[in-house]
Structure formats: C-alpha cells, structure tokens
C-alpha cells in the first residue's frame, strides 16, 4: 500500500511529466489486456489458492471454473478504474475514501488469513526518503534499499559469507536442455549462505527501529557464519 505515496513523492521531487500522464500506459494495458503466456498459464493451473478468492477467481478463471489458458487475453477493468481515479484525484484517493475502505474490508474478510489493517493505518501513511544501505564485496561497493526492507541486509550477509570462497572457480555446467547452469557446489554454497542470512533476517530484521545493521554486516561476524557452511546441508539454520 505504500507504493502510491512513494511514487507521488518521487514525482513531486523529480518528475517532469504531469502526474496523470504517467498512468496512461498502465491504464491502456489494463483495459486492452495482454495475451496469457504458456508460463503464466502453467502457473495458474498449478496455483492452489486463487480459486478460493472470488475476485481472483473471476479474474484468472473461465466461466466453467477452469484456469484461463495460454493465448487468452487477460484484461483488468477494475485496475483501470483505480488507476483512472488516482490519475484524476491524486494519491490521497488511495488512502482515504472508497478505495481505502474497500482495501480494509478485503483484508478483514479474508477467509483463511484475515489481517488487521485499519483505515487509520492507510490515512496516516507517509513515504520517507532514506539513505541507501551499502556494503563492500571484494573490489565493489553494492548498494540497495535500507530497512524496513531486508533484501540488502540479506544480500550483504550472503556475499560476506561467500567472500572467502573462490566462487569464480565454480564454473557453470551444461544443463539438461543445453543451457548453462550453476554447478551443484555453487548452488550448495549459495543456498547454505542464504539459509543463514534468512535465519538472521527472521530473528533481527523487523521494524526499522533497533535493527542491528552494522553487526549483521560485520566482516568478522560473517566470517564466523561462513565457517558454519560445510559439505552437507545444515538443515534448519539458526540465527
């Protein structure tokens, strides 16, 4: 839900085109639709949850109850109407009024996983400018989004745990379809580092306050974590 405010802030500070103009390509795509690809059709056929949501079922399923197939044109007139409202009325229309009320009602009425989002949550939300989070990896500096996002912290931990490994020596191998694929050793090392990084993420990264970012990206700490990676799967990683 924060995306609209973030886009509005970016437009306010850096935009050149009128706000409403930015919505035109997305509105056109939502109204005219796109052709479902074989990959999307396969995902729809395998998804166990969409059919349980009336709105998702109406969007992704045919009248006979089967998922829409490859080659079918998928349109989204409801999304087009929302985008037209935002284009004409501005970002506040997303956080107050009918759209906000509909979002809150939908969250509360979810049949299996109802949420606690409130109208006050939406109305009070403000986008914030934050300094990027950067870390060193070999001869490079890599930067990404800081907290409350956890992605850059996790990536920095994975890279830090693997920095002592000669990853360049783990050359790609030929896949079954003739394509290049990562070697089993490279996959193992990355997977184990990711297990450890996500264990820390789940333990330490939540609200933006009091996240120990410096400690999580400390080279000495990551070297210790990296030593936990052996030749076999560690199973469930611990923070």
Model-derived regions, located:
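Noncatalytic scaffold domains of N-terminal-nucleophile
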Residues: 1-96, 100-150, 167, 227-232
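Gly/Pro-rich active-site capping loops and adjacent beta-alpha segments
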Residues: 1-14, 151-188
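Short conserved micro-motifs at the rims of enzyme active sites and ligand-binding pockets
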Residues: 146, 154-156, 209
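Short alpha-helical scaffolding segments that buttress acidic/His motifs in well-ordered protein cores
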Residues: 26, 83, 158, 193-197
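Low-complexity, intrinsically disordered regions enriched in charged/polar residues
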Residues: 38, 116-119, 152, 211, ...
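Internal maturation/activation junctions in enzymes
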Residues: 167-239
């Amino acid at each position: 839900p924060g995306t609209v405010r973030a886009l509005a802030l970016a437009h306010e500070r850096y935009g050149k085109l009128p706000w409403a103009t930015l919505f035109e390509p997305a509105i056109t795509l939502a109204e005219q639709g796109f052709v479902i690809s074989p990959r999307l059709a396969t995902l729809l056929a395998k998804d166990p949850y969409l059919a349980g949501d009336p709105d998702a079922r109406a969007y992704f399923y045919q009248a006979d109850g089967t998922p829409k197939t490859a080659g079918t044109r998928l349109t989204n007139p409801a999304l087009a109407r929302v985008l037209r409202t935002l284009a004409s009325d501005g970002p506040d229309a997303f956080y107050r009024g009918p759209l906000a009320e509909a979002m809150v009602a939908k969250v509360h009425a979810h049949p299996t996983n109802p949420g606690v989002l409130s109208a006050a949550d939406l109305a009070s939300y403000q986008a914030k400018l934050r300094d990027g989070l950067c870390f060193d990896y070999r001869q490079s500096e890599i930067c990404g989004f800081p907290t409350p996002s956890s992605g850059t912290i996790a990536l920095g931990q994975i890279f830090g745990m693997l920095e002592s490994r000669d990853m360049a020596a783990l050359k790609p191998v030929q896949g079954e379809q003739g394509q290049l694929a990562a070697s089993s050793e490279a996959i193992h090392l990355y997977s184990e580092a990711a297990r450890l990084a996500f264990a820390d993420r789940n333990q330490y990264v939540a609200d933006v306050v009091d996240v120990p970012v410096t400690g999580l990206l400390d080279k000495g700490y990551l070297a210790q974590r990296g030593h936990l990676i052996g030749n076999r799967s560690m199973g469930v990683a611990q923070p």
